[in-house]
Amino acid sequence: MKLFAIVGSNADHSYNRDLLNFIKKHFTDRYDIELGEVKDLPMFKEGVKEPAAVASFAKKVADADAVLISTPEQQHSVPSSLKSALEWLSSAEHPFKDKPVVIVGTSVLPQGSARGQSHLKLVLSSPGFGAKVFNGDEFMMGTAPEQFDENGNLPAGTVKFLDHFFDEFDSFYAEVSK
């Protein structure tokens, strides 16, 4: 399965980028994962012609079998850089229409990205997107700095849950892709 994985933060060092890199490495035999960076997109501005970087990003979303988004939580929601990218992606081409989407996330806070993920699911399910959002188990890892070791690996229990989480997503994908 070809996944376009969106790093939902514009931070130079992002634990969500670290999480996606771990997922890419861990599931290398299962998925073909390409990372996309919201930090490479300009801030959304209504009435402005879609920039080439946005068109390229939208094509990667459209060409993927499914989209994986890793988001932190900022002020009980998603970061403004991710929201801006979503504004671009809902303003013209609508590449998320009927696209299976799976959301993960991590944060330095104990609750992980719980509220950010909840808000993101609401946005992606709205009429401007129409994505098929996976609503099974949730992966929202808290206290990110304590989770990754010096090689970017995660604890065995976390990896076991991540395996289960993606097994559930694969079942969802098989169902919605019929």
Curated annotation (Swiss-Prot):
Family membership: Belongs to the NADH-dependent flavin reductase family.
Subunit arrangement?
A: Requires LJ_0549 for activity, but the exact composition of the enzyme is unclear.
Is NAD there in the keyword field? yes
Q: Look up the domain of life of the source.
A: Bacteria
Give the CC-aspect GO terms: cytosol
Cross-referenced PANTHER family, in alphabetical order?
CHROMATE REDUCTASE, NAD(P)H-DEPENDENT FMN REDUCTASE LOT6
Q: What Pfam families does its record include?
A: FMN_red
What is this protein identified as?
A: NADH-dependent flavin reductase subunit 1
Can you name one GO molecular function term for this protein? FMN binding
Q: What class of enzyme is it?
A: oxidoreductase
Function of the molecule: Component of an enzyme that catalyzes the reduction of free flavins (FMN, FAD and riboflavin) by NADH; the reduced flavins produced by this reaction likely spontaneously react with oxygen, yielding hydrogen peroxide. Is responsible for the major H(2)O(2) production in L.johnsonii in the presence of oxygen. Cannot use NADPH instead of NADH as the electron donor.
Q: Which gene encodes it?
A: nfr1
According to UniProt, the reaction catalysed is: a reduced flavin + NAD(+) = an oxidized flavin + NADH + 2 H(+)
* Consequences of knocking out this gene: Cells lacking both LJ_0548 and LJ_0549 completely lack the NADH-dependent flavin reductase activity detected in wild-type strain, and show a 40-fold reduction of hydrogen peroxide formation upon exposure to oxygen. Reductase activity and H(2)O(2) production in this mutant can only be restored by in trans complementation of both genes.
- Coiled-coil intervals: none
Which Gene3D superfamilies did the record assign? Answer: 3.40.50.360
Enzyme Commission number(s) of this protein: 1.5.1.36
Keyword match Acetylation? no
| Source organism | Lactobacillus johnsonii (strain CNCM I-12250 / La1 / NCC 533)
Q: Name the UniProt key words of this record, in alphabetical order.
A: Flavoprotein, FMN, NAD, Oxidoreductase
